[in-house]
Amino acid sequence: MIEPEAVLGLLDYEITTIERHGGGIRISARYSGPISCPHCHGTRLRSKGRYVRRVRQESIGRRACLLELEGHKWRCLACRRQFRQRFPGILPCQRASEAFQRMIFGQHLDGINRSRLGKREGIGAATVERYFQRGLQRQFSEWHSRRCPLILGIDEHFFTRRKGYATTLCDLRNHRVYDVVLGRSELSLESYLQRLEGKSAVRLVCMDLASVYRSVVRKHFPNARIVADRFHVIRIVNHHFLNCWRELDPVESRNRGLLSLMRRHRHNLKPEQQARLAAYLAEFPGLDLIYRFKQRLCYLLLKKHRTRKQCQLLAVRFLKAIHQLRQAGLPQLVSLGETLHSWRNEIAAMWRFTRSNGITEGFHNKMELINRQAYGFHNFENYRMRVKLLCG
């Protein structure tokens, strides 16, 4: 005996016939469950005739499946309204069951383009897109919470040349993308952040040294502590140091071997590399002092898991280093000192809180892969929904 639920994936259906139809299968069935009025939910009904509804059903193997459902036209004796019978698993005014739409959604999500999938299943490319959009909306309502996460990561990434950059909001606690917003200026983010729920519950926000994002967080997340991303802080220290080196020695600063040695932390150098670097720095005593200062500053910034009392001692050393940079007299070092002074509170929070934006940067790599697989996105909302589904 054929189990209707095993074939159709739907409850309370009775299969009357299964026959070959062209190159596919045609299944005739009827609904045997309870029927009620969709207007008043009354059960006192009078039949006004029969009709047959034909919809596409999920394919069986590689053969397309057509589902023919025998239904009734009913008149409710309570509210005196007439209606056609509704079938569970098939939405009103739809030519395909929910199971078939989920199948199209899954195949399109796996990378089959709309035109090829439409030709294979005998539907239009626009219909494939419509089923896909419905599937995305259904997944969002099931998976994504509207409230803002407690630990948030904010960073920017490039979208298109015409529309520019987009801002990524990442849930650092649960390792998923919370949302993607077009734009990176305070004006473009204003309307979105005003509608955001649960902003007062956010406790920590991690970001790079972007003044725009800092002002946005201070305005819209009043209870959040801002923590600078360690990678970006050390990168900006190296950036100013290398620019200062180019001003002091324009010739040797182009040497890729020396450039690699200058950029690394001292503990990552092999003994022969340390000897080569020491021989070069011996020729420039002033550059040697700057290099040693940079190494001490980087080691100071690399510290983590510190107590409150330990952070107070580190803060004294950090403020002293900032003062020395601002009094150095070299433009690149003075600029670095001003930047660190402007971000001193957010940088000091790195010693106490170990959260970083590495998770967000990793999702940016995945988002770039999504963009390449789709050969680019013109519609930002399509891109946003695809990212939230695959990275959320």
Describe the residue ranges of each PLM region.
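Short, conserved DNA-binding cores of transcription-related domains
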Residues: 1-81, 87
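Acidic/histidine-rich catalytic cores and adjacent linkers
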Residues: 30, 34, 39, 46, ...
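Short, positively charged, Gly/Tyr-enriched micro-motifs
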Residues: 54-163, 199-202, 347-348
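Gly-rich Lys/Arg/Thr-decorated short loops/hinges at beta-loop-alpha junctions or inter-strand turns
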Residues: 87, 170-176
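Active-site beta-loop-alpha junctions of metal-dependent nucleic acid enzymes
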Residues: 95-96, 177-198, 204
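The DNA-recognition helices of helix-turn-helix-type DNA-binding domains
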Residues: 124, 135-139, 244, 354, ...
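Short alpha-helix plus adjacent loop in nuclease-associated cores
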Residues: 233-252
